[in-house]
C-alpha cells in the first residue's frame, strides 16, 4: 500500500497566486473592468453581475479554481485603483481578507485592522497614520466556550449548559452551587422550595428521599396543602408542585440530578424556575393598543403585545403547577407622550388587553427644560435615554415593590436602556434587536458621516455594540439573524468587524457566541387562523373589506381602482420605507406586462390622509405616485392606507385566500424576521418573501412558499408569473402551497413554543450566572469605559427635538 503523506494546506494567497499565473489575462480583464468604474464598494451581487457579463468561455476559466471560489464567496470588493481588496466569506462566521494590485498582479493577505484601514481610505479624512481607537472583545472571550458546530449556533444556552455541566459537576461537593441557587429562591422575603433546615447537599438528598418515599404512598391527585405541614418539618416548602404527582416528578428530577448531573436533566429542572417580575423595554414610538399609526409603531408593538400575553399565560401555568399562590407582574415600559393625539399614550399605566397582570408603564422623556411632549423618531431618541433610564428605575421600584427578575430589551434604544437597568439592578438581561440598522442600510458604517445628520447612526451602532456585549443572552427569531446562510451574511455576523471612520474600528465585536438563542415568535392565533375555519370567520367585516379592495371611489383611504375583480390579487402590507421595498414591488409589477394581465396588485402602506412626519416615508410616497403615473397602473392597482385594526387585517388575509388564487408578497431588501410572513401563512395565504433575512428560513422554497431576491426584480416578477400560470392550469398547486405554509407554522412558529423556551433560557442563564463567571465582569468594565468616553458624547451630540 502506498505511504500516505500529510501535505500542508495552502493559504488563500498561495492558491490565488497559482490561479493568477494560469489565468492571467482573464483575471486582469475582469479586475480592470471593476477598477474602471472608479473607487467605491462593489457588493456581492454586483461582482456576480460583472462575471456574468463576460463571454461564457472566459467565464468558465475564471470560475474554475481558487479565483472562482473567491468571487463566489466575496461579500464586497473595496476598489481603490490600482488595488482591489476583497472580504471573502468561505462559510458562515469565517472571514478572510485579501487585496490584489491589478497592474502588478500582486496578492496580499490582510488582517482585519489592515482591511478596515484600507476601506477607510474610501472616505475623505482617513486616518493619515494617526492612532485610531480599535475595539476588540476577543481577549475577554478567549477562555470562554464557543460553539463550532452549526447546529449549536442559535442554541447557545443549551450548548453552555452541556459545557459547564461537564466542567463543574464532578462530585457531590461540586453540587453545592445548585443547593445555594435553590436557597436564594424567595418571594417577598419568603423562601420557596427549601427552608433553613437544609444546609448541605447530603441533607438535601436525605430529605428528598424521605419525601419521595412518602409521596409514593398517597394518591397522585392529593393537593399539596394536605401534606404541606409534614414537608415543612423536614425542610421543604411550597414551590415543588400543586399535587403529589407534580411534587414527586420535581423531587425525582432533582434526585437524578444530584446522583448523575446530566445537562438535559439540569435544563429541565432549571426550566421550571419561576420568574415573577418581568420588564420589557420599548422606549421609542407611540406604544398603545389602539390607533397607533406612526412609522415606528409597526411589527415591534404587535410582537411585544403578543409576547406579553403568551409569557403571562405560561407564567401563570407554571405558578399553578408549582403549587404557589403568588402574582406575577409584566411591565412594558415605554414613553409617556403628553401630546397623545387620540391615543392612550399619555396614560401612565394601561392594562394589556386579554391579560390579568400585564401593564404598559409609560415614563416621559425629559430635559432640563421639562417633559418632552411630542413624538420623536426612533433615530432621534439618543440624547434622552440616560436620564430616561434613571427615571424608569425609580418607577420600576415603585411599581414592583422591588427589583425585576428579568429585563428584556427591544430594538437599539430598548437594548441600551435594558443594559443600563440590568447593570444598576444586577439582574438577568435579554436583548432582541428586531432589526439592526447597519444591516438594513448598506454602507451606513463606512459612510456614517453622510447619514448622521438624518439617522444618527454613530450613536445607534455604538448603542448596539454596547448592548450586544453587555447582555446575558440574545434572542433572535431565526438562524439567519445570527449567522446568515451560505450566501447571505447574518445580521449579527456583519457586526464582527466594521469601521466608523474617524470614530473607531471594531476588529472583533462578537463571535458566534453561546449567548445567541433562536426563539421564534408566532402570530396571535385568535386573530390569524386558516381561511378554512369557517365557524370562526369574521364575515361581518366582509362589506368593509369589499369596499377597501373594490370600491370605485378614490379617497383619503384608498387610491386607484381595480377594474377586473375576477383577477387574483398580489397583496402586500408593510411600513412604507425604503427597506420594506414596497415601491420596488410596484415597479416590478409595472414593468411586467404578463403579470399585469394575470393579476391585480393591492398595497397597504403609508398614510394617504395626512402628510407624514417621517422623511423616508415622504420620499417613498412621492416615488409611489410617480410609479402610478409612469406605468399607468390605475385599473390594475389599489393603494390603501395603513390599517390599524389587526382583527380585520386577519380577515383581510383570509378574504384574499378565499379566492384560492391570490398571494401575499414581502419584497423587503432585508427583513430581520418577517411577522407579516408568519401572519399570512397562518391564514393559509401562499406567501412570496425576500430571501434576505428571516423569511429565507421561515419559508421552505417551493413547499411552504417562495423566496424572492429584492436585487433581481425581473426574476422575482417572473417567479410570480410562473406561480399564477401554474395555479391557473392546476388549482391544486395553490392549495398545496397554502397547506405547506400552515404545516410550517404549526411546527415552528407559535407563541406557546416561544414562551416555554424563553422562560427556560432565563432559568438556565440565571443559574450559570450565579455559579460561574458568566457575567464576564472584565468585559463589562471595558464596556463601562467605552460607554462613558465614547457613547455618551455621541448621544449628547444628537440635537434635541424642537417643540
Curated annotation (Swiss-Prot):
Lineage: superkingdom: Eukaryota
Function: Sucrose-cleaving enzyme that provides UDP-glucose and fructose for various metabolic pathways.
Protein name: Sucrose synthase
Family of the protein in this entry: Belongs to the glycosyltransferase 1 family. Plant sucrose synthase subfamily.
Pfam name, any one: SUS_EPBD
UniProt keyword annotation of Transferase present: yes
Record field: catalytic activity: an NDP-alpha-D-glucose + D-fructose = a ribonucleoside 5'-diphosphate + sucrose + H(+)
Listed InterPro entries: Glyco_trans_1, Sucrose_synth_GT-B1, Sucrose_synthase_pln/cyn, SUS_EPBD, SUS_N
Gene Ontology BP terms: sucrose metabolic process
Keyword terms: Glycosyltransferase, Transferase
Classification via SUPFAM superfamilies: UDP-Glycosyltransferase/glycogen phosphorylase
Span list, region GT-B glycosyltransferase: 274-750
EC number: 2.4.1.13
Amino acid at each position: 500500500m502506498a505511504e500516505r503523506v500529510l501535505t500542508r494546506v495552502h493559504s488563500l494567497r498561495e492558491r490565488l497566486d497559482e490561479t493568477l499565473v494560469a489565468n492571467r489575462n482573464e483575471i486582469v480583464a475582469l479586475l480592470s473592468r471593476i477598477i474602471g468604474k472608479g473607487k467605491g464598494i462593489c457588493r456581492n451581487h454586483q461582482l456576480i453581475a460583472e462575471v456574468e457579463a463576460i463571454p461564457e468561455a472566459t467565464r468558465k476559466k475564471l470560475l474554475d479554481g481558487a479565483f472562482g471560489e473567491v468571487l463566489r464567496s466575496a461579500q464586497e470588493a473595496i476598489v481603490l485603483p490600482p488595488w482591489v481588496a476583497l472580504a471573502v466569506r468561505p462559510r458562515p462566521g469565517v472571514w478572510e481578507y485579501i487585496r490584489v494590485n491589478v497592474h502588478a498582479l500582486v496578492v496580499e493577505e490582510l488582517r482585519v485592522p489592515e482591511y478596515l484601514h484600507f476601506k477607510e481610505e474610501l472616505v475623505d479624512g482617513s486616518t493619515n497614520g494617526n492612532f485610531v481607537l480599535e475595539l476588540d472583545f476577543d481577549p475577554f472571550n478567549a477562555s470562554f466556550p464557543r460553539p463550532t458546530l452549526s447546529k449549536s449556533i442559535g442554541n447557545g444556552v443549551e450548548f453552555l449548559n452541556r459545557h459547564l455541566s461537564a466542567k463543574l459537576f464532578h462530585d457531590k461537593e461540586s453540587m453545592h452551587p445548585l443547593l445555594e441557587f435553590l436557597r436564594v429562591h424567595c418571594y417577598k422575603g419568603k423562601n420557596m422550595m427549601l427552608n433553613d433546615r437544609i444546609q448541605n447537599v447530603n441533607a438535601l438528598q436525605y430529605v428528598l428521599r424521605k419525601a419521595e418515599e412518602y409521596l409514593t404512598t398517597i394518591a397522585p391527585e392529593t393537593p399539596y396543602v394536605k401534606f404541606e405541614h409534614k414537608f415543612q418539618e423536614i425542610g421543604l416548602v411550597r414551590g415543588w408542585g400543586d399535587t403529589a404527582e407534580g411534587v414527586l416528578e420535581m423531587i425525582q428530577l432533582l434526585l437524578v440530578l444530584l446522583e448523575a448531573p446530566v445537562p438535559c436533566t439540569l435544563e429541565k429542572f432549571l426550566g421550571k424556575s419561576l420568574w415573577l417580575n418581568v420588564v420589557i423595554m420599548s422606549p421609542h414610538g407611540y406604544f398603545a393598543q389602539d390607533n397607533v399609526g406612526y412609522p415606528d409603531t409597526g411589527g415591534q408593538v404587535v410582537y411585544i403585545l403578543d409576547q406579553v400575553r403568551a409569557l403571562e399565560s405560561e407564567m401563570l401555568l407554571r405558578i399553578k403547577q408549582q403549587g404557589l399562590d403568588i402574582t406575577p407582574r409584566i411591565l412594558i415600559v415605554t414613553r409617556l407622550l403628553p401630546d397623545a393625539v387620540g391615543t392612550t399614550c399619555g396614560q401612565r399605566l394601561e392594562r394589556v388587553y386579554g391579560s390579568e397582570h400585564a401593564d404598559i408603564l409609560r415614563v416621559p422623556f425629559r430635559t432640563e427644560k421639562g417633559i418632552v411632549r411630542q413624538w420623536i423618531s426612533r433615530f432621534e431618541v439618543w440624547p434622552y435615554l440616560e436620564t430616561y433610564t434613571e427615571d424608569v428605575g425609580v418607577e420600576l421600584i415603585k411599581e414592583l415593590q422591588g427589583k425585576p427578575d428579568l429585563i428584556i430589551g427591544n430594538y437599539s434604544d430598548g437594548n441600551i436602556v435594558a443594559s443600563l437597568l440590568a447593570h444598576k439592578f444586577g439582574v438577568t438581561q435579554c436583548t432582541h434587536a428586531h432589526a439592526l440598522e447597519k444591516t438594513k442600510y448598506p454602507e451606513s458604517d463606512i459612510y456614517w458621516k453622510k447619514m448622521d445628520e438624518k439617522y444618527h447612526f454613530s450613536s445607534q451602532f455604538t448603542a448596539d455594540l454596547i448592548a450586544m456585549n453587555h447582555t446575558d443572552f440574545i434572542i433572535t427569531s431565526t438562524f439567519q439573524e445570527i449567522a446568515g446562510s451560505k450566501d447571505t451574511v447574518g445580521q449579527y455576523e456583519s457586526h464582527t468587524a466594521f469601521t466608523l471612520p474617524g470614530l473607531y474600528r471594531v476588529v472583533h465585536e462578537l463571535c458566534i457566541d453561546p449567548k445567541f438563542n433562536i426563539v421564534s415568535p408566532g402570530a396571535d392565533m385568535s386573530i390569524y387562523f386558516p381561511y378554512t375555519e369557517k365557524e370562526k370567520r369574521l364575515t361581518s367585516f366582509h362589506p368593509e373589506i369589499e369596499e377597501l379592495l373594490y370600491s370605485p371611489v378614490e379617497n383619503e383611504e384608498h387610491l386607484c381602482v381595480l377594474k377586473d375583480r375576477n383577477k387574483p390579487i398580489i397583496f402586500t402590507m408593510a411600513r412604507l420605507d425604503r427597506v420594506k421595498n414596497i415601491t420596488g414591488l410596484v415597479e416590478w409589477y409595472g414593468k411586467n406586462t404578463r403579470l399585469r394581465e394575470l393579476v391585480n396588485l393591492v398595497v397597504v402602506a403609508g398614510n394617504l390622509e395626512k402628510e407624514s412626519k417621517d422623511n423616508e416615508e415622504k420620499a417613498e410616497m412621492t416615488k409611489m405616485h410617480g410609479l402610478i403615473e409612469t406605468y399607468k397602473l390605475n385599473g390594475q392597482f389599489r393603494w390603501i392606507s395603513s390599517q390599524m385594526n389587526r382583527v380585520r387585517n386577519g380577515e383581510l388575509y383570509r378574504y384574499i385566500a378565499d379566492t384560492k388564487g391570490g398571494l401575499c408578497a414581502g419584497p423587503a431588501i432585508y427583513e430581520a424576521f418577517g411577522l407579516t410572513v408568519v401572519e399570512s401563512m397562518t391564514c393559509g395565504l401562499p406567501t412570496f418573501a425576500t430571501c434576505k433575512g428571516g423569511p429565507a428560513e421561515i419559508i421552505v422554497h417551493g413547499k411552504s412558499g417562495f423566496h424572492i431576491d429584492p436585487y433581481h426584480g425581473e426574476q422575482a416578477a417572473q417567479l410570480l408569473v410562473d406561480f399564477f400560470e401554474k395555479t391557473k392550469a392546476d388549482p391544486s398547486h395553490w392549495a398545496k402551497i397554502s397547506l405547506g405554509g400552515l404545516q410550517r407554522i404549526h411546527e415552528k412558529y407559535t407563541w406557546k413554543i416561544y414562551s416555554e423556551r424563553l422562560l427556560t433560557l432565563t432559568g438556565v442563564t440565571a443559574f450559570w450566572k450565579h455559579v460561574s463567571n458568566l457575567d464576564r465582569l472584565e468585559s463589562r468594565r471595558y464596556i463601562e469605559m467605552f460607554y462613558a468616553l465614547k457613547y455618551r458624547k455621541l448621544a449628547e451630540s444628537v440635537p434635541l427635538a424642537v417643540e
